[in-house]
Amino acid sequence: MAKGIMYIDGQRVPFDGEKNVLAVIRKAGIDMPTFCYYSDLSVYGACRMCMVEDEKGKIDASCSMEPKDGLRIRTNTARLKHRRMILELLLASHCRDCTTCEKNGSCTLQRLALQFGVRRVRFQDTRPHYDIDDSSPAVVRDPNKCILCG
């Protein structure tokens, strides 16, 4: 694991052993949204919510970037304003029975939609709707609530 100094939004941030740039960003106290990243699983990088821009203008998912000494990134540039649209696209194809969902009140999708000011969805739901699989006594799987995290 690498060790060094990164610059995040102009802030000098030391790192020592963090496995990706996302971990360094969070260590710096910056709230970086993610849907598909879980530290104990392999990196997928599909949700595109944790995108950052480096000093050369390259955009990449911070969860899949290794921290490097001297790396300079920005977390909130004009080119990174796509997060709101990603949320709208997820909500367009998402089952909207929030009041009966067990995650209501602690749902990351709800929290981020509120945080990014998504009040209405401009896109049509074009995905097929699936039956709920409640064949297991322990797990109920509702594929209509999938957020395509991987």
Language-model segment annotations:
Residues 1-11:
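Eukaryote-biased recognition of intrinsically disordered, low-complexity regulatory segments
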Residues 11-69, 81-82:
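N-terminal cofactor/phosphate-binding cores enriched in small/glycine residues
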Residues 48-150:
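Fe-S ferredoxin-like electron-transfer domains
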